[in-house]
């Protein structure tokens, strides 16, 4: 068994709400901090439950989440063995990396998002149907009617789901959703990017115009421009809340 590093004060009792998720987050943070390096074994359930101030049933549910994320592997006779987080792509692991590594890693994640932009725009302009055009206009209207930053943020996410659906590329949809899900519960830290409605609406209207005109080049450029601009606003919002 590989002995983990100092563990005595790493844990704080999780909030009572959604205890299993809080347990998973606490242990995941310890893993990412190197308290439990790859190949090491987590402490016995009784010890972990005592340190976290939770019962063993809740602890097992939290450990099950970690196993689902791929951060640990349960081996009979050996306990919960830590896997290498750098080899994992589960959105919850990526979200944990954003939480631990901060703005620099968020920038890297948003670079992936922006890189998908030209393909999204090009395919949407080439493949969208009249039904897609109607759905895009309806989604844009929801963004226009949003009267708070949080509502605008939610409407923007919904707009892009409609836009990506119009590409008729399921793999692209899965990739974009992976990036979106990687933000996990951190969306609130990015809401400030939607405080000013004008740049959001201006760019989304340009995307709509290019897609509905069936202009792949213009659509590719407008989607990429919007994702790059919104990424800058998101990083600023994230840093302002740090």
Swiss-Prot record:
The organism's place on the tree of life at top rank: Bacteria
Gene3D superfamilies recorded: GntR ligand-binding domain-like, Winged helix-like DNA-binding domain superfamily/Winged helix DNA-binding domain
Keyword Transcription regulation included in the entry's annotation: yes
The entry's keywords: DNA-binding, Transcription, Transcription regulation
Domain HTH gntR-type: 17-85
Pfam families per the UniProt record, alphabetical: FCD, GntR
DNA-binding region location: 45-64
PROSITE patterns in the cross-refs: HTH_GNTR
Molecular-function annotations in GO: DNA binding; DNA-binding transcription factor activity
InterPro entries associated with the record: GntR_C, TF_FadR/GntR_C, Tscrpt_reg_HTH_GntR, WH-like_DNA-bd_sf, WH_DNA-bd_sf
Protein name per the record: Uncharacterized HTH-type transcriptional regulator Mb0505
Species name: Mycobacterium bovis (strain ATCC BAA-935 / AF2122/97)
């Amino acid at each position: 068994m590989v002995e983990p590093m100092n563990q005595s004060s790493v844990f704080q009792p999780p909030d009572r709400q959604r205890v299993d998720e809080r347990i998973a987050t606490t242990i995941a943070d310890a893993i990412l901090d190197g308290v439990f390096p790859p190949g090491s074994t987590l402490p016995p359930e009784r010890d972990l439950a005592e340190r976290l101030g939770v019962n063993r049933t809740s602890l097992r549910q939290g450990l099950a989440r970690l196993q689902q994320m791929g951060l640990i592997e349960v081996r009979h006779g050996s306990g919960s063995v830590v896997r290498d987080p750098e080899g994992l792509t589960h959105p919850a692991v990526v979200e944990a990396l954003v939480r631990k590594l901060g703005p620099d890693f968020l920038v890297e994640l948003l670079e992936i998002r922006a890189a998908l932009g030209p393909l999204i725009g090009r395919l949407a302009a080439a493949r969208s149907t009249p039904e897609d055009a109607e759905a895009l206009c309806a989604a844009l209207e929801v963004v226009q009617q949003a009267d708070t930053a949080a509502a605008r943020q939610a409407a923007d996410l919904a707009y892009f789901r409609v836009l990506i659906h119009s590409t008729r590329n399921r793999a692209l949809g899965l990739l974009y959703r992976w990036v979106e899900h990687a933000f996990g519960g951190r969306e609130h830290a990015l809401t400030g990017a939607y405080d000013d409605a004008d740049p959001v609406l201006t760019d989304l209207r340009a995307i709509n115009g290019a897609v509905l005109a069936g202009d792949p080049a213009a659509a590719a450029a407008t989607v990429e421009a919007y994702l790059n601009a919104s990424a800058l606003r998101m990083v600023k919002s994230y840093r302002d809340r740090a």
